[in-house]
């Protein structure tokens, strides 16, 4: 777009539908271009081109289309894509979903402006995720180890304490090693004012805000803003990681609200719906977010992602968790059954998986016994869980002494390893030591997945 076109204001708005408006009689317009909008009463708003064909442009209005009409609304195409000003001064600040300060502080003086859509990384320029990220949560650090550069979602359900878990991870997460810089970028989408106040209070009272950048999009904010919030958060994370050499953990919650906004916008555009009404491009859209995690050759920093989503009706085959599972490297599943038992965090380790856990375990990363003792504990817990179903049918009297030991181990595992205080920050060494202590419940002959050397070194003597 040339300089002359940037000064032209169009009044040829032909239709307004939901958050979208259609402008006709234009030329030289590009997809993703930012639009300045002036309402009939002189208020300034911002939009983005969603579709450009021939002489027609479909524009999404970030602040909503209330008070706009087709006769008096003025539109100017800027020729620029959506950008955010980034700076290390963003650490310790809280912003709204569009990147405007929400904490009463001054505007950020940007070191540079960056396109919020990021830039595609050549796979050859990526390094495989490596090195341990400690969250202080035993069921993550121990059994589903998080690795720098990884993307691993948390699958939750309505009413489960995923917000509490997200805040705890944001407070406690750290990387090990001398002189390593660490930051958290936290983005909440479509949350209530009550949830927003909870997150802000948690970050402020614990001091976690000092190492964090927080973006909050409320449920009553425009759905369009929900689409750009995770992109702004990831752009900030990439800047801190690749230009400032920091290891950045990005927590995105709730991706279900993000996908609902995608569906709402697709419906307003009269697009042909895909599975359960979601747009057919939802897979590629989610991939454009998740694939921004990683390690880049020649760069010290890393971007690690924990997207959180609530599964509608606890259905793990729903399109949102289903497509997310194809793109990411595992999943952490919260269990309603464990939650009913009063267990926090209610992480069910059996369906949970970190496909890259091995990259963050072992000498120099965690401890030499990590992988083996977790394998042993996982197998024993799975057997104990299976025996509970048998007890429900035949009663505990029918069990052998061996079976009773595994049943006892499963109960103890949930009580000592899975169960953890909201403010309890466990090191990986503490987690592994607890597991070794619980393994004394089992006959030594059943410890087939750990070597005699490890048993001699770590198993407490009775």
From Swiss-Prot:
> Topology with regard to the membrane?
Peripheral membrane protein
Instruction: Fetch the SUPFAM superfamilies from UniProt.
Output: C-terminal domain of alpha and beta subunits of F1 ATP synthase, P-loop containing nucleoside triphosphate hydrolases
GO MF terms held by the record? ATP binding; proton-transporting ATP synthase activity, rotational mechanism
Primary residence = membrane
Q: Which InterPro entries match?
A: ATP-synt_VA_C (IPR055190), ATPase_a/bsu_AS (IPR020003), ATPase_F1/V1/A1_a/bsu_N (IPR004100), ATPase_F1/V1/A1_a/bsu_nucl-bd (IPR000194), P-loop_NTPase (IPR027417), V-ATPase_su_B/beta (IPR022879)
Functional description taken from the UniProt entry: Component of the A-type ATP synthase that produces ATP from ADP in the presence of a proton gradient across the membrane. The B chain is a regulatory subunit.
Q: Which family does it belong to?
A: Belongs to the ATPase alpha/beta chains family.
Name by which UniProt lists this protein = A-type ATP synthase subunit B
Originating organism:
Methanococcus vannielii (strain ATCC 35089 / DSM 1224 / JCM 13029 / OCM 148 / SB)
The organism's taxonomy opens as: Archaea, Methanobacteriati, Methanobacteriota, Methanomada group, Methanococci
